[in-house]
Amino acid sequence: TFYMNPELFHEKRVIHYLGKNYPKSIPLFETFLDRSLKYKGVEKEIRDKLNFYKKIYFCNHHNAHIAISFFLSDFKEAAVISIDGAGEITSTVLAVVQDNKIEVLREVDFPDSLGMLYNSVTYYLGFNPISDQGKVMGLSAYGDYSEYIDKFRKIIKLNDDGTYRMDLDYFEFQNKRNTWISEKFLSTFGPRRSSDEEIEKKHKDIAAALQRRLEEIYFHMGAYLKEETNMKHLCLGGGVSLNSVANGKLLQKEYFEDIFIPPPTGDDGLSIGAPLYYNYCVLKNTERFPFVSPFLGPEYNDDEILKTIKRFHLRYQKSDNIFKETAVLLSENNIISWYQGRMEIGPRALGNRSI
């Protein structure tokens, strides 16, 4: 199985999107065409490198996100929200899963995209737009959203059907590669912060407003799904679902009794999601194997750890009561790196490799 449908990507991105937005889309033509050819070449690459000549199933991108978020849970049925930058063309899916069948209720297509919105503001704040969204989420806790929230409410608005739409005049990602924001965005929020500039109160407040607007859209989608499906449970998938702050606040709204989010909920989990979709939705197998633990990575014993410490000439001491000493250090506002047991899967710290 593979986590992208090459034919659908070519149809939606290269033919439909580029054609619909011509001539503005010309700068994206090479990028989208290269990606399309890469995806179309996946089958040959798999067969050549692995000597594999059986069937290869190409799973729609968001079906793979939905599959890992639902089929690893122990829910028999659930509402599902899948949000990322974009798959073949879709950026957000609101769905329900019953009897191992996925029913899509609503979709949002690129360039309207919560993922691209968050990426763009991450870039504006001086961080890597592809990998540093978590830093912006963390930064938001230090800011006050009140000054900028109305600006973000103008940038991304709510639709009555549980979806949203963006004012794309603030952005350039839909027209050019590696160009995220427009002059209108800069005239609204001021100059972009470079990565070596000090983070000021303004940057914290903008991060807080972005985070708040994301949460408002989360609540909007959650309320819609609850009303439409009356499900007790919700599953979250896609890279935006790594926003643990928004996830926690959505749970607190009590639209749903419980929420399941797989640790590798971004594209890193699609190698699990695609075969899960094929197993349950194509082959129609019914036996479920719920997710038991995120701690599936490597672990190292004391001898191995000590050997590494000595190799790098690090100072160390053995503690008689590591929990008490850690509590004291934390109470004194120290930063702790916590390392125990097997490493968790996924990009978020879940207790065994944490700061």
For each feature predicted by the language model, list its residue ranges.
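Short acidic/glycine-rich loops and adjacent helix/strand connectors
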Residues: 1-355
